[in-house]
Each structure stands twice: as C-alpha cells, then as structure tokens.
Amino acid sequence: MPSLKDLKNRIASVKATQKITKAMKMVAAAKLRRAQEAAEAARPYSQRMNTVLANIAKAVTDADGAPVLMTGTGKDQVHLLVVCTAERGLCGGFNSQIARFARDHVRKLVAEGKTVKIFTVGKKGYDILRREFASLIVERKELREVKKIGFENADQIGKRIIEMFEAGEFDVCTLFYSEFKSVISQVPTAQQLIPAKAPEAVAEDADHAGAVYEYEPDPAAILDDLIPRNISVQIFRALLENVAGEMGAKMSAMDNATRNAGEMINKLTLSYNRQRQAQITKELIEIISGAEAL
C-alpha cells in the first residue's frame, strides 16, 4: 500500500498533467476553428477544379493529344501511395487510422501482384508505416518546421510526384488523407491523382449541361497546364483537411485526458483521505490505550 506521501505526490503529479492537457485542449480548440475554416474554404475550389478538368478532358478523350498525366502509362503495375499524416502525436487515433487505411490498401495491392511504393507526408505516418513497409518507402516529406500550411508546400510535393511519374517510377498514384467531418469524426479517404480521374466520374453542372465550349488554346494544351496544378490543389486540400482533423482529434483526446485525470485525482484523494483517517484512528487508539495503561 502506498504511503500518504506517495499518494500526495501522485495527486500533485496528476493535477500538473491535468493542467497541461486542459491547456492543450484550449490551444487545439482555437487552432481548430481556423483550420476548419481553411479546409471548408478549399473544398469548393478543389471540387470546381475537378469539374473544370473533367469538362475540358471530354474534348480530348481518346485523342492523340491527351496528356499522359490524364491517360496514364497504359499499365497498372506500379502504384505510388502518398500517405498524409500529422507531424505530431497526442491526437488519439488520428494518425494510426490513416496509416491503417493505407496499410490495408498496400496489402490488397501486394496480394494482387502489384508493386507498391510509398511516399509519406508527415513524420507520424512514416514512423508507423516503416515498421512493416520500410523497404517500400521511397520518399518522405516532413512539414515540422512549417507553422502554417501553404499552397507552396503542396506544390513542392505535387511537382516531386510528377517528376517521379515522368521518370517512369510508377503507373498509378493515390493520395491518402483524412477528410474532416466534425470534431469526433475524421474519415480516411483515398483519391487517385494520376492518371487524372475519368471525366465521367465528375458530373457537369446541371445549369451548363449540354453547353458547347470553345477553348483557346486547344484543350490538350490547357490540360498540360491544368492537370499539374490540379494535383497540387488536391494535395493542398488534403493537407488542410488533415490539419483540421488533427486539431479536432487532439481537442477530443485532450478533453478525454483531462476528464480521466479528474477521475484519477478523485480516486487518489479518496484513497488518501481513507488512509489518513485510518492512521489518525490508529494513533487515537494508541493514545487511549496508553492512557488507560497509566
């Protein structure tokens, strides 16, 4: 049984931890609002980019001038998985959820006889995936020093992916991230980047259905510029979704930790009071017994 001094020290230690988790919860809550606004603002732009890309792509489908980023290599053997996670932990199962989703995809592809390569964005994803797939990780990117995610960060990743594709290092590229739904809900998501999604997969706006477009210069030339930018835009959106999801998960995790610390403090305090009461009672009995002996 721990002594009164040990219990007192443990209570003080848990109270100090509770102060830290409560402060971290408040910081995460403040960051969450800004991150959520940024993620929600990026969604319409990225979705519209996909729609525009699909509409232009219709004009060059099966044409000789279609960009290779849209048509692909014609093969489906080598897959590059770009797995985006957070740089830090203390956010519940946020990182492990994305990594587990990507890991299941890797196992499925390997079972089908495909060659898999992994590009990790974020330290935690790398730390988790290297335990099982160290030999498959061909590229890693950490954003630990980046205070605020900007488009230039996503653009660097996008350009590196395109460089790898043009060098013939893979046939298909899929982006993995966590889509922010709410503080308690972040959904692991997979999005194919290369080849660009088939035009029919993105519906044209109902108001413009059947409209005839004229492109200047030709559609293929526009796609040559648009597809690389769209890849960076989709990565940027994924990074923003991840930040919002991370802050939501962190706020929830720190709230749980704060409440658990409170429960532990109550239990330790109760144990301390009982032991102290028993000790006082014992001392009183000893005093009374001594007095009677006299």
Swiss-Prot record:
It is a peripheral membrane protein. The keyword Ion transport applies. Transmembrane segments: none annotated. SUPFAM superfamilies: ATP synthase (F1-ATPase), gamma subunit (SSF52943). Pfam families: ATP-synt. One of its GO terms (cellular component) is proton-transporting ATP synthase complex. The keyword Transport applies. It is found in: Cell inner membrane. Belongs to the ATPase gamma chain family. This is ATP synthase gamma chain. The gene is atpG.
